[in-house]
Amino acid sequence: MKLPIYLDYSATTPVDPRVAEKMMQFLTMDGTFGNPASRSHRFGWQAEEAVDIARNQIAELVGADPREIVFTSGATESDNLAIKGAANFYQKKGKHIITSKTEHKAVLDTCRQLEREGFEVTYLAPQRNGIIDLKELEAAMRDDTILVSIMHVNNEIGVVQDIATIGEMCRARGIIYHVDATQSVGKLPIDLSQLKVDLMSFSGHKIYGPKGIGALYVRRKPRIRIEAQMHGGGHERGMRSGTLPVHQIVGMGEAYRIAKEEMESEMARLRGLRDRLWNGVKDMEEVYLNGDLEQGAPNILNVSFNYVEGESLIMALKDLAVSSGSACTSASLEPSYVLRALGMTDELAHSSIRFSLGRFTTEEEIDYTINLVRNSIGRLRDLSPLWEMFKQGVDLNSIEWSHH
């Protein structure tokens, strides 16, 4: 077993060696390096064929038509293209959008930008376990609501929203439904031929493909229109201009092909490891699970260790690559906005750690992690005056702390 142990698969994954090997064939003079938009020679045709194969591989994993897959630079761009693209195209119909407070920043900040442009956005607060109350969603829907954006799996706490029911609710009212599926694709079954989802964002690097490539699913029947955000040569049926990066697209396609083959057995394995990790720490005092194991992704475990400062905990766990929040926001010392939206105190939010497991995680690593966490928490609490006061029965909420 090698240290440090990587348990931050929700931030990014290593490229699968099978994917890397495939990508190498599309870079050099000896390989298929052509521009797929070059229609006048073999180099272009071969590149175009490789892109078509990858488009099919992605469509097959999610039950879509390959013509519904639009390549982008990643899920952040897909979220932007979906939300801004739909809002701009349908704004004559209405200017109201619904999302949730626990979405990824790529959705929240896109909605904030649209608010500056005159759109109105309702941000739903989830229930304590992170699940959106569908009655609240229904109550928020209005005649001028044009778009709902609610993710499939939350990147911090792993809870799974009921996108099938939300899709039915939106379709019944003629509202477009966008789903950020970055954390669920290849981990949970997705069948867009059955789901009433109109737009869905995907990433390559969360599923053992390369960084810098993603896709947006845009439904054809009923046809969804979006306004391009990137203008140029009219690539991707006019929705996203820019020369297609064939090596990255091929990598994403291969990663999705592997995921389709291995998803069922791999997710059962990861669920077992996640449960083993939780069972190994849950009997400690003042340890709380964030999210919901029953309605959760099999590979994410978010736990708060009360009376331990999150930053010092991460320092103590230097042999583990884990995070306190998502990589995009963990650089700031602010507690996770996702956990705060669940109604958690700043103290508890600060002491939370996200463990995300993946393809190369072993049972040995999980057992090492359990021991390390138990020892580190014990040591840090021994040093903590707050823990001492808590053990003496002092109600810490009743203390007036002096500001200095």
From Swiss-Prot:
- One family from Pfam that matches here is Aminotran_5
Q: Which cofactor does it need?
A: pyridoxal 5'-phosphate
Location of N6-(pyridoxal phosphate)lysine modifications: K206
Q: Which domain of life is it from?
A: Bacteria
Q: Which GO terms describe its cellular component?
A: L-cysteine desulfurase complex
Residues noted as binding pyridoxal 5'-phosphate in the record, renumbered to the chain: A75, T76, N155, Q183, S203, G204, H205, T243
Q: What is its EC number?
A: 2.8.1.7
Output the PROSITE patterns linked to this UniProt entry.
Answer: AA_TRANSFER_CLASS_5 (PS00595)
Annotated keywords: 2Fe-2S, Cytoplasm, Iron, Iron-sulfur, Metal-binding, Pyridoxal phosphate, Transferase
Residues making up the signal peptide according to the UniProt record: none
Residues bound to [2Fe-2S] cluster are C328
State the reactions this protein catalyses: (sulfur carrier)-H + L-cysteine = (sulfur carrier)-SH + L-alanine
Q: Tell me where in or outside the cell this protein is found.
A: Cytoplasm
Per the entry, what this protein does is: Master enzyme that delivers sulfur to a number of partners involved in Fe-S cluster assembly, tRNA modification or cofactor biosynthesis. Catalyzes the removal of elemental sulfur atoms from cysteine to produce alanine. Functions as a sulfur delivery protein for Fe-S cluster synthesis onto IscU, an Fe-S scaffold assembly protein, as well as other S acceptor proteins.
Give the protein name, as stated in the record. Cysteine desulfurase IscS
This chain's source organism reads Klebsiella pneumoniae (strain 342)
